[in-house]
From Swiss-Prot:
Quaternary state and interactors: Homodimer.
Organism ancestry: Bacteria, Pseudomonadati, Pseudomonadota, Gammaproteobacteria, Candidatus Pseudothioglobaceae
Pfam family, one: Rib_5-P_isom_A
Pathway terms, separated by semicolons: Carbohydrate degradation; pentose phosphate pathway; D-ribose 5-phosphate from D-ribulose 5-phosphate (non-oxidative stage): step 1/1
Classification via HAMAP family: Rib_5P_isom_A
Keywords: Isomerase
Entry function: Catalyzes the reversible conversion of ribose-5-phosphate to ribulose 5-phosphate.
Record-linked InterPro entries: NagB/RpiA_transferase-like, Ribose5P_isomerase_typA_subgr, Ribose5P_isomerase_type_A
A GO MF label: ribose-5-phosphate isomerase activity
Gene3D superfamilies: 3.30.70.260, 3.40.50.1360
Binding site residues for substrate: 28-31, 81-84, 94-97, 121
Name of the protein: Ribose-5-phosphate isomerase A
Family: Belongs to the ribose 5-phosphate isomerase family.
Enzyme Commission number(s) of this protein: 5.3.1.6
């Protein structure tokens, strides 16, 4: 089974977590795109969705799924999104596509967070995938220096990339994240950081992991 086939399978499985007649949250990225395509087959069962990026909103609308402004929504039943890495406690690194801030906001509002990924994303210690940090542009060099001094790793500005919020992304390479919650909090305390790609203080409730033998369900 190829990686795309595993993503397709977990996306189909995630439909079981979609609650009828509710508004759901939808993430951003290649696995989330598989889910959006799958969601289109049951779109009449839901009121619509809150999108975590402009790209996701466009894909939802292309499928005829109503997209809601989060400020006009009182509740989100379920948030479904992929991940760049997950540990066994369902702490995540997200934001490889640069949508981490909006993803984190929608995940915070949602009653439950279902993460969908292929088996390559499950690791014992996170950090092999560069950790994204969204920063205010004028603070980029200051934040880089603070990360080098206080966190470690190698922070680099992502070239030719601006977030939907008009900000820069710093990617921190060569990390070993042994305490995800503490690192998430510490990074967010640096002036100029909007947020970082660690989803530990609000991790996933369920991880649907695509494997060659089917979908493995891990709960927290």
């Amino acid at each position: 089974m190829t990686q795309d086939e595993m993503k397709f399978t977990v996306a189909q499985t995630a439909l079981k977590y979609v609650i009828k007649n509710t508004i759901i949250g939808v993430g951003t990225g290649s696995t989330a795109n598989f889910f959006i395509d799958a969601l289109s087959t049951i779109k009449n069962n839901i009121k619509g969705a809150v999108a975590s990026s402009k790209a996701t909103a466009q894909r939802l609308e292309n499928h005829g799924i109503r997209v809601f402004d989060l400020n006009k929504v009182t509740a989100i039943s379920t948030y479904i999104d992929g991940a760049d890495e997950s540990d066994n406690n369902l702490n995540l690194i997200k934001g490889g596509g640069g949508a981490l801030t909006r993803e984190k906001i929608v995940a915070a509002v949602a009653h439950q967070f279902i993460c969908i990924a292929d088996e390559s994303k499950l690791v014992s210690i996170m950090g092999s995938f560069p950790l994204p940090i969204e920063v205010i542009p004028m603070a980029a060099n200051y934040v880089k220096n603070q990360i080098s001094q206080k966190i470690g790793g190698i922070p680099e500005v992502r070239k030719d990339f601006i977030t939907d919020n008009g900000n820069f992304i710093l990617d921190i390479k060569d990390l070993k994240i042994t305490n995800p919650k503490a690192m998430e909090t510490k990074l967010n305390s640096i002036i100029g950081v909007v947020t970082n790609g660690l989803f530990a203080n609000r991790g996933a409730n369920v991880l649907l992991l695509g494997t060659p033998n089917g979908v493995k369900i891990i709960t927290n």
